[in-house]
């Protein structure tokens, strides 16, 4: 990518896993130069712990829609999803009717999959009634890393914690919550930090050199 320099902090050789952006910050390579929507998502959202209910619901929903598709497609429709699902306000989505679902199936700005749209409404209703809450369940399955993954190849598709959380969510009535999509949710909301070694947001990035 123009303006970005691939690096490897451990070997000094070229790597596709970390790049230096135009602002001088080392990032996971998928974030690009850091001056795009993807870069801002990497810097400000992905891997950042949150207890915000709407943020949790949004992350879970985007994971639902990602099933069978690429993340870039879903990511590019984030604003449309926010509009369609009422800012991911849980109570407002839980109150959506069959007529609302029918309307969203015709909305070309989002992914028009009736099953996933209905699952989003059902998941909002589960969030409204379930105990422990989604926030509490996610936190109870937190993964603490002393060292960052050495490369993207080291990132798992799922973990025992993701499998446990998926089972807990299914028991509460959540839908489209398999271990793989749940692990992606955990990465998104900072229950696990999977920024790779050398990225300025990685768990083992030198404290004295950490860039904020």
List each language-model region with its residue ranges.
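HhH-family (HhH-GPD) DNA N-glycosylase catalytic core used in base-excision repair
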Residues: 4-212
């Amino acid at each position: 990518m123009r303006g970005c320099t691939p690096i490897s902090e451990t070997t000094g050789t070229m790597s596709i896993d970390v790049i230096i952006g135009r602002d001088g910050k080392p990032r996971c390579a998928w974030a690009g130069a850091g001056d795009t929507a993807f870069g801002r998502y990497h810097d400000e959202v992905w891997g950042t712990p949150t207890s915000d209910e709407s943020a949790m619901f949004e992350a879970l929903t985007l994971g639902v829609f990602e099933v069978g598709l690429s993340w870039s497609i879903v990511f590019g429709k984030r604003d449309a999803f926010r509009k369609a699902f009422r800012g991911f306000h849980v109570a407002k989505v839980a109150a959506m009717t069959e007529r609302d679902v029918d309307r969203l199936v015709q909305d070309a700005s989002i992914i028009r999959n009736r099953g996933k749209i209905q699952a989003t409404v059902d998941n909002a209703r589960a969030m409204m009634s379930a105990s422990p809450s989604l926030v509490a369940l996610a936190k109870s399955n937190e993964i603490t890393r002393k060292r960052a993954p050495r490369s993207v190849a080291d990132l798992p598709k799922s973990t025992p914690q993701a499998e446990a959380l998926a089972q807990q969510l299914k028991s509460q009535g959540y839908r489209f919550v398999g271990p793989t999509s749940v692990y992606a949710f955990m990465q998104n909301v900072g229950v696990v930090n999977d920024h790779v070694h050398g990225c300025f947001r990685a768990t083992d990035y030198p404290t004295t050199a950490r860039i904020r």
